[in-house]
């Protein structure tokens, strides 16, 4: 009986094809080749340790099955040295980072932010938990009520198995690792995993009363997952509202997650899939992939991670531009009773929009704190830079970052600086208390059970405006031919060319009705 390379333990179809292409086309040849000869063939995914494993497993198969062996693989099957000016494929490829080298790369800063949006209780926080191991509902009220109230944050490392041609997160690999299996190896085939990148998740609340919080989170996202529960009719009110929010924020890299497929039959899942396709027709998510998932049981999470790599690319880093940082959280990390000499300065969390910053540099925070009737910018120095439990020397665009400062922690506690803009002194835009907006209204009110037409803005009407991560009250002061003059309270400092999401009170709730572009 003859055996194929795929019969050797640990060798899959892809690796077998690579071996055949290199001249190692039988189990006998593999069992006789020397380790250095096999590794010198430069076959993707086969280093010295992997070569030794494959050769030993081939020898075991030969001995157990009594396969007749042939003379050792001839030396001429190894590729000859290229001519002096000849370019080879291997010189172009960047050597993948594997094994123990992953330990340091996992500590690197995340490269992009992926948002999770959708209707309340459709499984956004559960999906983050399945991918990262973190439960982002950390606050007591969130845990008591079972819903996300604040923006949740978590980080993940994306890894790749060349043998299985599959993607997974570091947490997924660790939780699936079998007893005795080495770290940083594929739980399915034991192949050493390759590092791809670190990413951050922004878990946005889905409840209707927290729409403004969701809008502020959208400003941090480079791409998004729109979660739709398979056990409910699609679309639900906040599913509509969140998709429009992504449109306003200009987020086009979207993945649709059809969650909770474990709770429905095959027929119900297919019916729900049809509803999703009909819902997104003609929207920015029209061509988005729809991935059926069970976040609770971990079904198809590998397809989700693959979609991250294929659809939501890391943004280009604009390191040479003036540093700007958008604050999404601020807090006091000191425990009650901490001695004065042991107190830490206030911490601000958010994302770098452009440029870079290092420990020890001076920064300015605008609008800052209120002094009588005006706002006074804050100036301080950066004492530390962190992402999760990892400390960094420099912060750059991509991922969610914590900046430790020399500020009195009383100024940062309780998210008091959310929405403020950070930069080097005297480089930030002016603080404004009035803005002229070119307004684009939606045809119909989103997020409400009852569909109704959006009416034009009225003089002295009160609005809720969200720009970046800042939420501010607006009052329509003047109605011009093609724009509106709106007063802002509190004043804001926003990046140039910002988009203002506009909501008005409808049936005692703020509903998204459109967006405005700043003029002048």
Language-model features and meaning:
Residues 1-79:
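Compact, charge-rich alpha-helical regulatory domains located at protein termini
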Residues 85-209, 221:
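P-loop NTPase switch module centered on the Walker A-proximal segment
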Residues 196-200, 204-210, 219-241, 249-270:
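Conserved Switch II/interswitch segment of TRAFAC-class P-loop GTPases
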């Amino acid at each position: 009986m003859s055996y194929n390379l795929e019969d050797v333990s640990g060798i899959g179809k892809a690796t077998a094809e690579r071996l055949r292409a290199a001249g190692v086309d039988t189990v006998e040849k593999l069992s006789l080749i020397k380790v250095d000869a096999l590794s010198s063939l430069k076959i993707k995914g086969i280093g010295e340790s992997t070569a030794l494993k494959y050769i030993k497993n081939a020898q075991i198969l030969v001995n157990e099955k009594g396969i007749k062996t042939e003379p050792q693989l001839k030396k001429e099957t190894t590729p000859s040295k290229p001519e002096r000016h000849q370019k080879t494929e291997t010189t172009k490829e960047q050597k993948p980072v594997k094994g123990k080298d992953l330990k340091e790369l996992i500590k690197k800063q995340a490269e992009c932010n992926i948002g999770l949006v959708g209707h309340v209780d459709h499984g956004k926080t559960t999906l983050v938990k399945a991918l990262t191991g973190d439960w982002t509902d950390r606050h007591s009220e969130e845990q008591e009520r079972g819903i996300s109230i604040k923006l949740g944050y978590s980080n993940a490392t994306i890894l790749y198995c060349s043998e299985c041609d599959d993607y997974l997160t570091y947490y997924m690999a660790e939780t699936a690792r079998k007893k005795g299996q080495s770290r940083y190896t594929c739980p399915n085939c034991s192949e050493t995993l390759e590092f791809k990148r670190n990413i951050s998740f922004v878990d946005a609340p889905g409840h209707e009363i927290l729409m403004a919080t969701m809008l502020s989170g959208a400003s941090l996202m480079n791409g998004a997952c729109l979660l739709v529960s398979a056990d409910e009719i699609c679309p639900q009110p906040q599913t509509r509202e969140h998709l429009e929010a992504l449109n306003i924020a200009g987020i086009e890299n979207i993945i649709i997650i059809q969650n909770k497929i474990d709770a429905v039959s095959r027929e119900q899942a297919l019916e729900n899939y049809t509803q999703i396709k009909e819902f997104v027709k003609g929207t920015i998510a029209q061509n988005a992939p729809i991935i059926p998932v069970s976040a609770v049981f971990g079904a198809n999470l590998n397809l989700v991670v693959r979609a991250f790599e294929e659809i939501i690319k890391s943004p280009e880093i604009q390191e040479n531009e003036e540093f700007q940082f958008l604050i999404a959280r601020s807090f006091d990390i000191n425990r009650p009773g901490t001695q004065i000499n042991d107190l830490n300065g206030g911490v601000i969390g958010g994302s770098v929009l452009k440029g870079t910053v290092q420990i020890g540099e001076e920064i300015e925070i605008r609008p800052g704190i209120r002094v009588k009737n005006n706002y006074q910018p804050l100036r301080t120095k950066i004492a530390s830079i962190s992402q999760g439990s990892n400390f960094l020397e420099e912060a750059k665009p991509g991922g969610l970052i914590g900046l430790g400062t020399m500020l009195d922690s009383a100024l940062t506690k309780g998210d008091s600086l959310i929405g403020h803009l950070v930069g080097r002194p005297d480089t930030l835009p002016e603080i404004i208390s009035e803005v002229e907006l070119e307004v684009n209204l939606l045809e119909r009110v989103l997020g409400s059970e009852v569909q109704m037409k959006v009416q034009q803005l009225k003089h002295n009407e009160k609005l809720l405006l969200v720009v970046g991560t800042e939420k501010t009250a607006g009052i329509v002061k003047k109605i011009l031919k093609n724009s509106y003059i709106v007063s802002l309270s509190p004043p804001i400092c926003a990046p140039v060319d910002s988009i203002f999401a506009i909501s008005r009170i409808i049936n005692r709730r703020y509903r998204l009705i459109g967006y405005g572009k700043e003029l002048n």
